[in-house]
A protein has these predicted regions:
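Extended, non-globular alpha-helical segments
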Residues: 38-65, 124, 131-136
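Alpha-helix capping/helix-boundary segments
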Residues: 9-10, 40, 108-109
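Metal-dependent nucleic-acid phosphoesterase active-site entry motif
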Residues: 1-18
Length: 136
């Protein structure tokens, strides 16, 4: 299964005390492939620095970059499906990588449910947790 993770869900999944820790553990166990672009990696690093610190950001990025479950995607066309330009990189990555799901808690992404082409399937963390549970 191929996913794109919005920064907000990645941020909450890395803490050892987080209820969402299962997401990063599932990634590390190879239960899904994480599709990223250089823009997404840059945003991940920036937000981890803001919310945690530089060392934590470096460790997170290293973990993602060195994982055999990470797929790097080149974006050749920008669809601009979302009103927030910063969010479009995630939708474009999902389309270009043919992702099964874009995982986000950001309600701005719900507009994608109304767009039939290109189709981007979005799920919240709890919805995706159910998807993983049903695969066991």
């Amino acid at each position: 299964m191929n996913l794109v993770l919005d920064t907000n869900v990645l941020l909450v999944s890395f803490s050892m005390r987080s209820r969402s820790r299962w997401l990063i553990e599932s990634f590390l166990a190879g239960r899904f492939t994480l599709s990223v672009t250089s823009e997404i990696i840059h945003e991940y690093e920036e937000k981890f620095c803001e919310h945690w610190n530089q060392l934590a950001a470096e460790n997170v990025i290293r973990t993602i970059l060195e994982s055999p479950h990470t797929q790097f995607v080149n974006i050749y066309f920008k669809f601009n499906l979302l009103p927030d330009e910063d969010d479009n990189k995630f939708a474009d990555c999902a389309i270009s990588s043919n992702a099964d799901y874009l995982i986000t808690e950001d309600r701005d992404f719900t507009i994608l449910k109304t767009i039939s082409f290109p189709k981007v399937h979005i799920r919240t963390l709890s919805e995706f947790e159910q998807v993983l549970e049903n695969q066991r």
